Regions:
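N-terminal beta1-alpha1 cap of cysteine-dependent amidohydrolase-like domains
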Residues: 1-85, 92-99, 103-110, 118, ...
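Amide-donor transfer/coupling interface in amidating biosynthetic enzymes
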Residues: 34, 74-77, 105-230
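Short, flexible active-site-adjacent loop segments at beta-strand->alpha-helix junctions, enriched
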Residues: 88-89, 123
Length: 230
């Protein structure tokens, strides 16, 4: 498994992701700095969470213009897998790798808590091939701008073509705040047209130890890696 984690000034979840990937694969992933203009052939690149460039202008806006983005787009064109988590998802949208927008949470407050994700009837994707529609994962979120919005046409295209990976799930009829940010259609993550790029707001790397709240993130990352290299 040839994996790498892309790191920007202000990234703060890169270490957690590196620990998670090493726990699964047995070796540390390569670290790609935002100024790197060359990268080896890789199976997977992960853009982790954090506050790249201090979230100036917009979350992910400056990072999306870093030299490494060209390499990341070349990686995608070669068929490589790409995962963007939280700020990584924001960067993918700002770089026009994934569609839509991520704006301030509906309550205009930072949110940090556990959420339940429901796997959707998605197109063939290595990130979801080992899961069934309706499977649930408990994975935490921590963000201020995770409210996914898109126009009606794009939302329909995402729904009709199986490009919605996860939705926040309501666990009971009396639960009213299951959607932590107000995302349209309860969207928590979306896929590229070929299913090999996934952007998601929840943090799987923060759910890899039963002593720290659960292991659903480890389950998700493990199955994703197995499919990517399989």
């Amino acid at each position: 498994m040839r994996a790498a984690v892309a790191i920007f000034p202000g990234s703060n979840c890169d270490r957690d992701m590196i620990v998670a990937l090493k726990k699964i694969t047995g070796k540390s992933p390569l670290k790609l700095w935002h100024k790197d203009t060359e990268a080896p052939n890789l199976d997977l690149i992960v853009i982790p969470g954090g506050f790249s460039f201090g979230d100036y202008l917009r979350c992910g806006a400056l990072a999306a213009r870093s030299p490494i983005i060209k390499n990341i787009k070349n990686h995608i064109s070669r068929g490589g897998a790409l995962l963007g988590v939280c700020n990584g998802f924001q960067i993918l949208i700002e770089a026009n790798i994934l569609p839509g927008s991520l704006v301030r949470n509906r309550k205009l407050l930072f949110t940090c808590r556990e959420t339940t994700l429901e796997v959707q009837n998605s197109l063939q994707s290595p990130f979801l091939s080992s899961f069934n529609t309706g499977d649930c994962l408990n994975i935490p979120v921590a963000h201020n701008e995770g409210n996914y919005i898109a126009n009606t046409e794009l939302l329909k295209e995402l729904e009709d073509n199986g490009r919605i990976a996860f939705k926040y799930k309501q666990n009971s009829e009396i639960e009213t705040d299951y959607n932590p940010n107000g995302s349209l259609h309860d969207i928590a993550g979306i896929l590229s047209k070929n299913g090999r790029v996934l952007g998601m707001m929840p943090h799987p790397e923060r759910s890899i130890n039963s002593l720290h709240g659960g292991t659903d993130g480890l389950k998700f990352l493990t199955k994703s890696i197995e499919e990517i290299v399989g």
